[in-house]
Amino acid sequence: MICPRCISYVQATELDLKRYNIQGIIHRLDCIKCNQFVAIKVNDDILNLDNSFNDKYENNWSEMKTNQERIIYYILCQIIYVEFDTPKPEKLETPYDYADKFDIVLIRWENGKPIGFYTVKPKGTEVYSTKEKYTMPVLDTAYIRSAYRNKGFGSEILLDIIKRFPDEDIGFSKPISNTMLKYGSGATSGKGGN
């Protein structure tokens, strides 16, 4: 495979993702010249998020269920967000852990491409540090790829979570980024975050 940015070859690094319930022989493909992430190889198939998955996904939020979707979430959460849209501490943005086993993960699809995700800690899930249980669904993480920001997808997260948990209070994990605080404040005031 060739890097689309600089037309150089890629090198493969094997990843052990079994702890995330991701099956298969997984290799991360990085350009040998520009050292940037290119794609993931799953067994003999290449998974490139810049290619379209038009045959499978509508323009909407979809709950993660399949092995391929777990890999897509891994790429968004552990590679794209961290390496291409580097979290900015001054905006209270932080790197994310991969979602816990009982978390609900939703991926946003637009024109057949995964453009972001959000995760929810379900009501009753144990808080590891205190052994208490969440008393309401909690929005834990949220991310939209930089190329798709300022197009209403952040506000959509709040609308989607409210739709999925009607008649329930919804919490937010902390720290909460400045951007999500803006969306949350706009949603509760009725003005929207955009």
Roles of regions detected by a PLM:
Residues 1-137, 163-173, 184-194:
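Non-catalytic substrate-recognition and accessory regions of acyl/acetyltransferase enzymes
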Residues 141-163:
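Conserved acetyl-CoA-binding loop-helix of GNAT-fold acetyltransferases
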